[in-house]
Amino acid sequence: MILYNIFLVKMKVDFINTVFPSSTKEYIPGTIYNNIKVGMRKIHFNDNTESILVYDTGGLHTDQNVEVDINHGITKLRLNWIIDRQDVEYYERQPVLNSEHIFTSQSNKVLRANSTKPVTQIFYARNNIITPEMEYIAIRENSLRQKILSYKPTVMSPEITPEFVRQEVASGRAIIPANINHPESEPMIIGKNFLVKINANIGNSVVSSNIEEEVQKMIHAITYGADTVMDLSTGNNIHDIREWIIRNSPVPIGTVPIYQALNKVNGVVGDLNFNVFKETLIEQAEQGVDYFTIHAGVLKNYISHTDNRLTGIVSRGGAIMAHWCTIHNKENFLYTNFEEICDIMKRYDIAFSLGDGLRPGSIADANDTAQFLELKTLGELTDIAWQHDCQAMIEGPGHVPMHLIKENMEKQIHFCKEAPFYTLGPLTTDIAPGYDHITSAIGAAITGWYGTSMLCYVTPKEHLGLPNIQDVKDGVIAYKIAAHAADLAKGNPSAYIRDYALSYARFNFKWHDQFNLSLDPETARSLHDESLPSEHAKSAHFCSMCGPKFCSMKLTHHLKEHSTG
């Protein structure tokens, strides 16, 4: 099967030029490793006097000069780095049931550790090794830090070095999701001392979507700024959808393996067992999944604490494991077999995303006993993961009113020893179906300010249906706003410069620059042009809100002219 190539060269260039006009891709070389080239987006000012570099998650999909054929996937950027470490070996991947093997360019040979030693970034970091991935990240994160000092000297540390990246990973305060079987991924970092990241969830269901649509969703998500993508498919062709996504993704891909494991036993929860789950883990490890959500903190004795909740257990993975524990009257097999799971993870460098299966699903249930019992257990599991040189981050809620968000962050830091926190929102009110990308972005900005490292987006379709491509874009933009607002509040200099540049353009009526510096130039331009569509209006010193006589900025310019005589 050959999919329609979504972005043929001209279509792709037209799309990128529409989404990000006056932008080009620029590659910054490494200094420790001479084979590193970090792709950034350069936004050119309309008068061509200046430009700024911004973090770009789109990989080759946002490079107008590169043709991407999604039927063959993107360049394996990290493959030589992985092979050069001489701690991996090729072997024949295990056969996969119910897979059409339609991604014909993918070899049956995959990588794993060639000894009992881990091949994880945390293992290298603890052994004082600065990997190419770490230098790549330092270049990405360090963008504009020196430049901003001339504007605003009282900001965070002026430079992020590869050594600083290594230290943060070694301590467990940050993770680099980078499966050795996903060499297409461009290294990124999740940790509170770095830019706040966002995740976009995609995936089919039994009633909607197909492979091509999910690949399109992924490309749209990363084009607009998603730092990672989770494939939460629960319908048909789960394995094949994931193969297409991974082979075309420059960002880390996460999954919830229990979904595919349940699919293998025809949806009968009682038929699940650790052997089925383990087989699924290895299949996905061989494909290149970069992080797994594992709901190992849903313990049998915690389930009764959800009985009096308004909305019970709302996590799909949490509900599956709670149901399994109740049917068999046994402890969660993800918990009892956790160390064996660690052994699998460290052979491929897959990061744990320790799932919050008992997260609150309504404001009424926020910060209750069940939620915090599980969080304490996730902290204990983090210690075990670290003992095995596995990377780990902690998932968080959910639905939490604004005044209770800080308590979540404080308890997570206490129980989980500063492992990165990764939250779904949280939604700050339950009364706005259709607008939950807004209700949750409010909570996301607050928790990001308090120290959450990655924000899982919520789309307008939350609680209503499966998101389409427009919903994905709306969710990503809402969460880019939240993450950027958090970065500003934390004093991250890489965030400040873009605000400064856009405000300068706004005050000086540089309309094209104002559009192009925004997160969504196409929307900004279209809203302006609804009432003032002519090109002449792009040089006018007013918009349709105030008109030429009541524009405060125009009047301020007159004041300045008067005061300078």
Curated annotation (Swiss-Prot):
Q: Provide the binding site for [4Fe-4S] cluster.
A: 543, 546, 551
Does the keyword Hydrolase feature in the UniProt annotation?
Answer: no
* Annotated pathway: Cofactor biosynthesis; thiamine diphosphate biosynthesis
Residue positions binding Zn(2+) = 399, 463
GO terms of biological process kind: thiamine biosynthetic process; thiamine diphosphate biosynthetic process
What InterPro entries does its record include? Answer: ThiC (IPR037509), ThiC-associated_dom (IPR025747), ThiC/Bza_core_dom (IPR038521), ThiC/BzaA/B (IPR002817)
Record: residues binding substrate: 201, 230, 259, 295, 315-317, 356-359, 395, 422
Catalytic activity, per the record?
5-amino-1-(5-phospho-beta-D-ribosyl)imidazole + S-adenosyl-L-methionine = 4-amino-2-methyl-5-(phosphooxymethyl)pyrimidine + CO + 5'-deoxyadenosine + formate + L-methionine + 3 H(+)
What cofactor requirement does the entry state? [4Fe-4S] cluster
Keywords, in A-Z order: 4Fe-4S, Iron, Iron-sulfur, Lyase, Metal-binding, S-adenosyl-L-methionine, Thiamine biosynthesis, Zinc
* GO CC, alphabetical: cytosol
Q: Which GO terms describe its molecular function?
A: 4 iron, 4 sulfur cluster binding; carbon-carbon lyase activity; zinc ion binding
Out of the domains of life, which is the source?
Answer: Bacteria
Q: What does this protein do?
A: Catalyzes the synthesis of the hydroxymethylpyrimidine phosphate (HMP-P) moiety of thiamine from aminoimidazole ribotide (AIR) in a radical S-adenosyl-L-methionine (SAM)-dependent reaction.
Report the family membership: Belongs to the ThiC family.
Describe, as the record does, how this protein assembles with itself and its partners. Answer: Homodimer.
Q: What is this protein called?
A: Phosphomethylpyrimidine synthase
> According to the entry, what is the taxonomic lineage of the organism?
Bacteria, Pseudomonadati, Pseudomonadota, Alphaproteobacteria, Rickettsiales
What gene does this protein come from? thiC
